[in-house]
Amino acid sequence: MIKLNMSDVISVLNMCKPYLIAIAVILVVGIVAAVMCKKMENPKRKLVRGNAILAMVLGVVIVANLICAGPMSTLLTLSTQAAETVSDETTEQSNEDCRTIAAEGTVLLENDGILPLKDTKNINVFGWASVNPIYGGSGAGALNDLYDRVTMLEGLEDAGFKLNGELTDLYTNYGKERADYGSDWSLPEVPAEDYSDELIENAKEFSDTAIVTIARWGGEGSDLPTDMSSVSYTNNSDSYNDFETGQHYLELSQTEKNMINLVCENFEHVILVYDGLSTFELGFVEDYPQIEGILWCAGPGQTGFDSLGKIISGEVNPSGKTSDTFLYDLTETPTWNNFGDFKYDNMEEFKIDESDPYVGGSVPTFVNYVEGIYVGYRFYETAAQEGAIDYDKTVQYPFGYGLSY
C-alpha cells in the first residue's frame, strides 16, 4: 500500500504551483467566455461556447503535459518504470565486501594471551546484546531489512564455536526489543539476580571461557544523552536505577556492571566485545583481571559478524585501528563541554516549515570549537606536551591504536 507524506504532497504542489495557476486562469477565462455569450443568438452562442470549451480543454491538456514533462518528470518516471532487482551475484559480492570491511576494521584493544581461542570451542556468551546486537547506525548508516543479517551468535557458530543455549534462551525470552533510536534510550539487560545458581553452575561446567557483550547505538538525528536522567529510558530492575543523575549513555549501566561482576566472579577467562558506534568509557576493565581480551566491533553491517567469529577463532588476524580516542572520562573533554545545539540570533527567516516531519521548526545552529585546530587527538597530544594533562591518566586507547595476533 502506498503511503503519502503530507510534507511531500505539499512540496510537489509547490513545484507545480505556476502550472496550477495557469490551469485556473484558463478555466476562469473559458467560463467567463461561456457566460458572456449568453445574450448572443443561438447559432453564434453555440459556436462561441463550443470554442470556449474546446480552448479550455486544449489549454488544460497542454499545461498538464508541461507538468508531466517538467516538475513531475522524475517522479512519474520512477513510479512507472519497471522495478529493478539486485542480482544474487551483486548481493553476494556486497556481503563479501561487508565481511572484508569488518575483518579489517574490528579493533583488538587488549589481549592478555587469551585470543585467538585455538583450543576452546565451547563459549558462554553473556549480555542481552548478544541476541540484539547493533548492526549499523541511522540515516546513511542504517541497514536494509530486505536482506538477511548474520547475527553475532551465528557468526560465532559459523566459526566453529558451540554456544551455551541456556544463556541464549535467557536473553531471547527476556521479552524486550531494542527501542527506536532517539525516542527511547533504554538499555535492556537481564538483572544479575535473574541468573539462577543452576544456570551459572551449568555455564561453568560448559566452559571456563566467557564473552561479555556491550552495545551502544549512535548516528545522525539524535545526540547521545549526556545525562540519562533527562531522557526517556526504562530501568531493568525495580530495586535500583540503571543511571543516576549526571551519568551518560557511553558508560556502563548498573545492570551491566552487575552482570560483569557476576561473570568475572565465576569465570577465569573473559573476553569483552564492545559493539558500539562511538567510543566508550572502558576504564572499568582495569578492575577485572579476568577480562583478558577486548574487541571493538563497531556496527559490522549485514554480514560482518561472520568476521568477528573468525577473528576470535584465529582464522582472521585483526588489524583494525581506532578511528577515535578512547578516554577514561568523557566528561572532562573539550568535545563534551562545548558541543550542543547553539542558535544564531535573527534566524527566524530561515526557520524550516513546521510541516517537515523530521526537522520542522528548526533554525540553523552552530558548534563552538573552542579548541581551535586542536580537535580530537591533536588536543590530547598537545595538552600533554604542554603539561596541561596527564596523558596516561586521560587517554586509554589513542587514535590509530590497535593490536594484532
Where are these regions (language model features)?
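C-terminal non-catalytic regions of proteins with extracellular/luminal or membrane-system context
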Residues: M1-Y405
